[in-house]
Amino acid sequence: MSGEQVDILVVDDDISHCTILQALLRGWGYRVALANNGLQALEKVREKVFDLVLCDIRMAEMDGIETLKEIKTFNPSIPVLIMTAYSSVDTAVEALKSGALDYLIKPLDFDKLQLTLSEALAHTRLSESPVTETPAAQFGMVGDSPAMRALLNNITLVAPSDATVLIHGESGTGKELVARALHASSARSRRPLVILNCAALNESLLESELFGHEKGAFTGADKRREGRFVEADGGTLFLDEIGDISPLMQVRLLRAIQEREVQRVGSNQTLSVDVRLIAATHRDLAEEVSAGRFRQDLYYRLNVVTIDMPPLRHRREDIPPLARYFLQRYAERNRKAVQGFTPQAMDLLIHYAWPGNIRELENAVERAVVLLTGEYISERELPLAITGTPVADAPHGDDSIQPLVEVEKEAILAALERTGGNKTEAARRLGITRKTLLAKLSR
């Protein structure tokens, strides 16, 4: 793993310190990306595969420990080095327990930094299996059912090619995880993975997001912006919910795919792009074509290779390992010593229909961990939709007044359910910071 091939992400809210580290690391032959807070770091880690993350421990909004845990949750294989002042060595020890590979004392000794980086990267090489870790293991795709094995086999076959991939499946089945695995296992893995949910934007905003815009192209366009195609140049562009785009956007997207070039909104300049396209939808695009709602020529361009996502109800044997996987994740995050599920609770999970698929299972397990006061998750902690019968409230005395902390937790959990588990959006809707939301959940 030579310096020219190594990508390092530096995370520090001290911009001057970031700049110094960037210049230093580049001088040693590394490629360097910067993030000025934890949220930026998570965005970058989701978009690109880094060989190492160098993260400060003291940052506003999301500190280094929380950033470390989120990175490790997303991809446990990324080595993370923590930077800390003398006064916070105890916190650095906590970081090691949370998965950090090592820590460095600030102000940094540059010789020590160079040695630690070399050792960390060497450790990473040695820890890699001769057989490359499966995309499933890297991105949390858990299960050994026939349907899951077939899915993983498809990923292994398709990933090395540059073919356009259409992922079809119900909401919550893990289409984005498959896109990430395809990118990470491809020759483009060192280049960006850019993700865009087409259903989240109206036509004009989607056009600007995809192709970029010139300054003054429309009201509010105060500077030129590159689109997602240009951002993904050399890498992979994942377009989720492609079946929801308008007829006009279908025409523009078709041209971009056919010609491998785009134009910013408000510009006549043509930009060549080298992008592997992965698209996903919950719709049956063949039916959409028959109904005249989706262009046949675009459908053929997208449908080069199809990967069908099995719904969770079609692979019930994967529910126990998935539930245990999420249990471990959220028990660690909430610092709870949870031993597992009662047989009755697991039986309910296995036999529930899961209309929201894996996402619904994850949310149910997270909710159960947050509400749990004992060692085993029982039907009491599971949502009413799963148990099928109301679970009696825990006694609070004759006046039946819930403690405020429980009321707050219920409000937070309700907000999380409505935002699909998005903690940042849930915090915004509740009028609190993300850090406050996480603190209240962990009580």
UniProtKB/Swiss-Prot annotation:
Pfam families: HTH_8, Response_reg, Sigma54_activat. Phosphorylated by ZraS. ATP binds at residues 172-173, 329, 359. Residues 7-121 form the Response regulatory domain. Residues 423-442 bind DNA. This is Transcriptional regulatory protein ZraR. The modification 4-aspartylphosphate is found at residue 56. The lineage of its organism: Bacteria, Pseudomonadati, Pseudomonadota, Gammaproteobacteria, Enterobacterales. GO terms for cellular component: cytoplasm. It is found in: Cytoplasm. PANTHER family: PTS-DEPENDENT DIHYDROXYACETONE KINASE OPERON REGULATORY PROTEIN-RELATED (PTHR32071:SF117), TRANSCRIPTIONAL REGULATORY PROTEIN (PTHR32071). The keyword ATP-binding applies. Keywords: Activator, ATP-binding, Cytoplasm, DNA-binding, Nucleotide-binding, Phosphoprotein, Stress response, Transcription, Transcription regulation, Two-component regulatory system. Residues 141-370 form the Sigma-54 factor interaction domain. It comes from the Bacteria. It comes from Klebsiella oxytoca. Coiled coil: none annotated. GO terms for biological process: phosphorelay signal transduction system; regulation of DNA-templated transcription. Activity of the ZraS/ZraR two-component system is repressed by the zinc-bound form of ZraP, which probably interacts with the periplasmic region of ZraS. GO terms for molecular function: ATP binding; ATP hydrolysis activity; sequence-specific DNA binding. Its main location: cytoplasm. The keyword DNA repair does not apply. Part of the Zra signaling pathway, an envelope stress response (ESR) system composed of the periplasmic accessory protein ZraP, the histidine kinase ZraS and the transcriptional regulator ZraR. The ZraPSR system contributes to antibiotic resistance and is important for membrane integrity in the presence of membrane-targeting biocides. ZraR is a member of the two-component regulatory system ZraS/ZraR. When activated by ZraS, acts in conjunction with sigma-54 to regulate the expression of zraP in the presence of high Zn(2+) or Pb(2+) concentrations. CDD domains: AAA.
